[in-house]
Amino acid sequence: MAKKSMIQRELKRQKLVMKYATKRAALKEQIKQTTFLKEKLSLHRKLQQLPRNSSAVRLHNRCMITGRPKGYFRDFGLSRHVLREMAHQGLLPGVCKSSW
């Protein structure tokens, strides 16, 4: 299980990304639209002044239950260990053991 501080840090980043998403997208669009170099530089400075953690690139997928960062399945939001256990217990609808 991941440290609680790491899980909370990721949640904080997710909140920041959602909070600044529209502002960040608007600035990026303005940068794309403008042709003047000085205006582009000033817009880049505004973009850089936003909090670092408000960028979606800094998010890392983590298991919802354990907080494990590796072996993450996007479809379920779980790590491979938890996914396997929940599938064996029948807690995931539509998931069954494969046999061929």
Curated annotation (Swiss-Prot):
GO terms for biological process: translation. Its main location: plastid. It comes from the Eukaryota. Keywords: Chloroplast, Plastid, Ribonucleoprotein, Ribosomal protein, RNA-binding, rRNA-binding. It holds the Pfam family Ribosomal_S14. One of its GO terms (molecular function) is rRNA binding. One of its GO terms (cellular component) is chloroplast. Coiled coil: none annotated. It is found in: Plastid, Chloroplast. PANTHER family: 30S RIBOSOMAL PROTEIN S14 (PTHR19836), SMALL RIBOSOMAL SUBUNIT PROTEIN US14M (PTHR19836:SF19). Belongs to the universal ribosomal protein uS14 family. Binds 16S rRNA, required for the assembly of 30S particles. Part of the 30S ribosomal subunit. This is Small ribosomal subunit protein uS14c. The gene is rps14.
